């Protein structure tokens, strides 16, 4: 058998894998990396094939352009760049691969700052760079690969795919635009100014690639159209705000209020009770007129300032349009408008739910329009505490600066009533309200009529029923809440499927508040803990030895059993066998104290310690020592005659002696005499016991003591006291075993060699 098969102690698979050899037959020595390194030119040749780096002009003059190797490829890329600038937005990956636009402030680069490693990594296709006319942006594009036709088709295909796959984002936070604005004639989606900016930025490709052509590119014309349309859009916006129709509501409300006040004044003059109300209404009307005049003056000054700023911005844009195709003022104004329009989006949820705390301390909210201001003015007419004219003017200025649509907020205010909660129109709640009310937009006439109808209500009715409406609305809300709560409780209680477990709730509450006993105990009527665990279930000290080993043989039947019982030192001296050792079972705590010799403590009050010691020594000497054993003598005839005589026991009333009026010395003397008489009294009990035992012999009378004193196991115990007192060590155990073996050998050798009686005699110990 082969040696390798014999040594296979593990599994066959692992042993085979460990013994297998690989000769490298499946290895392809001709690696592609070697061919690539061989085919690549050297560094010197690579530097010769590369074009010279562009020389940057630091004076913002005309930059000399470097000629390309192929003019047709440049024209094709120019057309493609124009298509990109026309409005097709690439995905992020395509923009990173084809066009890189730097939005940060550009630091002018020198030829030394250009990384050579990026040029060395792509020897066949290098990047050419050319600065924009303003010298602030650098656009890089790759040269086409040698196979031009295939690359052109691939580029066209990628452009078409990007057009189809580019999602057209929905317009965010736009309710409806009914303002007379002109639509921009471009492929850009409406409501996205970032895409306009990207289109104008991407239009720079045409100028950066081909600066030799005198013809303006498509992107330039489109960017100019975007700028002109943006300017027209802003002009139309401000013209729209200058229209007097926007503030027609205030004039209508004012006229209606004046008419109603004149009618009410004629009625109130006749009634003396309403004269005070008329005076208050006149004062409120005067305050309202003053507030409206201040609002108008502030509004006119605000609009004129905004128009003046816009004209200056337009003039600066016209001057800078020749040097830069991308207008910086346009981006600033558009970004300001976007920030003001979407200012609330930056708010967090907690900030957006902070409502107006008070009329005088709260700041005006951004995004409120003229209708909301008119609503606030009328509410201030009803309430005595009105906002100041400066706050209202500031609110108006924020309305114009925010750029929100007029009719957009008018729809919101038309749906809000006095009982509704006026939420913020910016931030988190703006989008929620816009989504809910997007499908419920009203026409211009309806919205205006609704606002006019709500504003032209009678001032008298509002003053009289203001507090009543508030109280009624609160009462109605409370009633509806109570009804809903009662109905829910009724349905839950009366339903057959589910009922509230009131007992469990009550028990749980009572258990938490009550003083509960620990588990296994209860409290009796006195409040004391009572253990419910029976004594048989309580754990006791378990003996380390079995009950057979530690059993106390109180009445041995044979001498050998007695000897083994005494030799069982584990039973006597092991503290773990408390349950089985006799004598410890009794409760010593219940026993009375041991008797003491009273004579030792009679004169204990004396301070002489030496004298007390002498008396104790003398008492111990004179103390009678009881005889060993029980020695009962046989009674004589005289003693037997005494038993027939009546011998009464002397008695005295101790209570009478103690409660007498005599002195303490006399009381003590009487008690001592009574004690002496009791000591001298002979009841004849010993004589009676001896008489009852006169028929028994001496051996029978002394049986108990003699049997215990002369027992065999007691004698062996005293004889083997040295062996029993030794510790159970290994040496002592070995010696005991050897002694037993020698003793057994003697028995076997001394016995007669009869097979039948040999083992039986050893077991019966008859040797």
From Swiss-Prot:
Disordered: annotated segments: 20-408, 439-501, 506-525
InterPro entries for this protein: Fyv8
Disulphide-bridged cysteine pairs: none
Biased composition (Basic and acidic residues): 35-48, 150-171, 180-196, 219-240, 285-299, 391-402, 459-484
Biased composition range(s): Polar residues: 119-138, 372-386, 447-458, 485-495
Domain of life: Eukaryota
Biological role stated in the UniProt entry: Involved in the resistance to unfolded protein response (UPR)-inducing agents.
Record family assignment: Belongs to the FYV8 family.
Name of this chain's protein: Protein FYV8
């Amino acid at each position: 058998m082969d040696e390798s098969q014999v040594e296979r102690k593990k599994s066959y698979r692992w042993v085979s894998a460990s013994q297998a050899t690989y000769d490298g037959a499946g290895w392809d020595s001709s690696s592609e990396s070697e061919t690539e390194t061989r085919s690549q030119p050297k560094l010197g040749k690579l530097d010769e094939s590369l074009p010279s780096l562009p020389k940057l002009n630091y004076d913002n003059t005309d930059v000399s352009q470097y000629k390309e190797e192929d003019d047709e490829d440049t024209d094709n890329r120019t057309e493609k760049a124009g298509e990109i600038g026309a409005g097709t937005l690439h995905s992020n990956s395509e923009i990173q691969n084809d066009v890189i636009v730097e939005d940060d402030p550009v630091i002018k680069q020198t030829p030394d700052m250009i990384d050579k490693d990026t040029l060395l990594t792509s020897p066949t296709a290098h990047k050419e760079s050319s600065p924009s006319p303003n010298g602030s942006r650098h656009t890089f594009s790759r040269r086409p690969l040698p196979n031009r036709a295939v690359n052109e088709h691939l580029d066209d295909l990628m452009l078409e795919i990007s057009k189809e796959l580019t999602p057209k984002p929905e317009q965010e936070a736009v309710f409806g635009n009914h303002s007379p604005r002109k639509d921009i004639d471009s492929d850009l989606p409406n409501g996205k100014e970032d895409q306009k900016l990207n289109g104008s930025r991407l239009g720079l490709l045409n100028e950066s690639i081909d600066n030799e052509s005198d013809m303006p590119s498509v992107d330039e014309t489109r960017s100019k159209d975007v700028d002109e349309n943006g300017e027209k859009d802003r002009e139309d916006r401000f013209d729209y705000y200058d229209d007097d129709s926007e503030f027609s509501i205030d004039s209508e409300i004012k006229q209606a209020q004046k008419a109603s006040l004149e009618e009410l004044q004629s009625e109130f003059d006749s009634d003396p009770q309403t004269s005070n109300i008329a005076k208050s209404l006149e004062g409120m009307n005067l305050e309202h007129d003053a507030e409206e005049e201040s609002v108008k003056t502030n509004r006119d000054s605000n609009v004129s300032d905004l128009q003046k700023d816009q004209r200056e911005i337009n003039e600066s844009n016209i001057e800078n349009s020749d040097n830069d195709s991308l207008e910086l003022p346009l981006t600033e104004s558009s970004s300001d408008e976007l920030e003001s329009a979407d200012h609330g989006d930056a708010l967090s949820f907690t900030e957006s739910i902070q409502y107006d705390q008070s009329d005088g301390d709260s700041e005006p909210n951004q995004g409120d329009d003229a209708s909301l201001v008119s609503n606030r003015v009328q509410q201030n007419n009803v309430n005595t505490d009105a906002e100041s004219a400066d706050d209202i003017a500031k609110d108006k200025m924020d309305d114009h600066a925010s750029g929100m649509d007029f009719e957009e907020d008018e729809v919101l205010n038309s749906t809000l009533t006095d009982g509704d909660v006026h939420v913020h129109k910016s931030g988190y709640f703006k989008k929620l309200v816009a989504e809910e009310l997007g499908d419920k937009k009203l026409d211009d006439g309806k919205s205006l009529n609704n606002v006019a109808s709500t504003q032209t209500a009678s001032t008298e009715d509002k003053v009289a029923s203001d507090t009543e409406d508030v109280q009624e609305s609160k009462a109605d809300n409370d009633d509806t809440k109570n009804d809903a709560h009662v109905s829910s409780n009724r349905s839950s209680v009366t339903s057959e499927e589910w009922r509230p477990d009131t007992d469990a709730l009550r028990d749980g509450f009572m258990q938490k508040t009550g003083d509960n006993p620990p588990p296994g105990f209860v409290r009796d009527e006195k409040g004391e803990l009572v253990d419910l665990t029976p004594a048989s279930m309580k754990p006791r000290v378990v003996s380390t030895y079995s009950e057979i080993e530690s059993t106390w043989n109180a009445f041995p039947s044979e001498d050998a059993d007695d000897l083994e019982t005494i030799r069982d030192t584990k039973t006597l001296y092991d503290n773990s066998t408390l349950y089985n050792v006799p004598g410890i079972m009794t409760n010593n705590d219940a026993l009375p104290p041991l008797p003491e010799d009273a004579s030792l403590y009679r004169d204990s009050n004396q301070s002489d310690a030496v004298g007390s010691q002498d008396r104790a020594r003398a008492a111990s000497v004179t103390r009678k020592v009881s005889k060993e054993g029980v020695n009962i003598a046989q009674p004589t005839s005289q003693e037997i005659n005494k038993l027939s005589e009546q011998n009464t026991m002397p008695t005295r009333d101790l209570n009478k002696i103690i409660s007498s009026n005599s002195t303490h010395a006399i009381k003590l003397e009487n008690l001592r005499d009574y004690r002496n008489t009791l000591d001298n009294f002979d009841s004849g009990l010993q004589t009676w016991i001896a008489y009852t035992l006169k028929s028994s012999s001496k051996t029978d009378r002394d049986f108990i003591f003699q049997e215990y004193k002369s027992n065999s196991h007691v004698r062996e115990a005293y004889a083997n006291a040295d062996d029993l007192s030794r510790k159970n060590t290994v040496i002592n155990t070995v010696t005991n075993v050897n002694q037993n073996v020698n003793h057994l050998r003697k028995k076997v050798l001394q016995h007669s060699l009869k097979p039948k009686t040999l083992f039986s005699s050893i077991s019966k110990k008859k040797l």
